[in-house]
Amino acid sequence: MLNKYSIFVIIISIFLIGFSTGKNDNPYVVVLGIAQDGGAPHAACTKDCCVDRWDNPQLHHMVSSIGIVDPSTDEVWMIDATPDFSMQLNTLTMDQKRLFKGVFLTHAHIGHYTGLMHLGREVMGANQIPVYAMPKMEAFLTKNGPWSQLVELQNIDIKSLQNENSVQLNKNLSITPFLVPHRDEFSETVGYKIEGPNKSLIFIPDID
């Protein structure tokens, strides 16, 4: 687990250097989590990578996710809705001072979509939050509860994605999904290419 965390941090750090040029109004990304689906430490883990973490909250890691921020418009987007969604959303929106514009899902493993539950009436009672999903991921959400209830109650508004077709987020940002190999039991798996005015970044949370 620790090796995967280290590789993730190194890769995302390299891309961050290229994506943000340091100007206050330039788009940038925020690393919201680096752990696998269960977080770190994860349930029932007694390996060396978990033992020291149980009693030290400073060593806890949230599940892999990044946020996209455009300071010029105060708009933010999230890639993947993890089990740590509530904390990650608060970090990304700076206590709701920024406008949350939607979630881009990568695939149907528990660390990457189950945070959508917070958008339902039991928690946020959200109103048509855009959730961007590939065809199989969209079908998974619309045909299976409790996710289908989010659609029926219009807590979320699913936006259909297609492989390598770009979505224009605003005048400064676009994002493009692309298929990657992974264990696709319930949906396809994608990475995302995020393009700003001058730089671009690729985010792939899971790949075989």
Question: Can you annotate each of these PLM segments?
Answer:
Residues 136-145:
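A short, active-site helix/loop in glycosyltransferases that binds the activated sugar's phosphate group
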Residues 44-47, 92-95, 117-121, 145-148, ...:
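Short, glycine/charged-enriched secondary-structure capping and boundary segments
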Residues 62, 67-132:
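Active-site metal-binding motif and surrounding structural segment of the metallo-beta-lactamase
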Residues 5-15:
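Sec-dependent N-terminal signal peptides
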Residues 98, 111, 154, 171-173:
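Structured loop/turn residues at beta-strand edges in well-structured enzyme cores
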Residues 13-26:
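Bacterial Sec-dependent signal peptides at the C-terminal "C-region" and cleavage site
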Residues 23-92, 158-208:
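Core dinuclear metal-dependent hydrolase active-site scaffold
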Residues 1-2:
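N-terminal secretory signal peptides that target proteins for export/translocation
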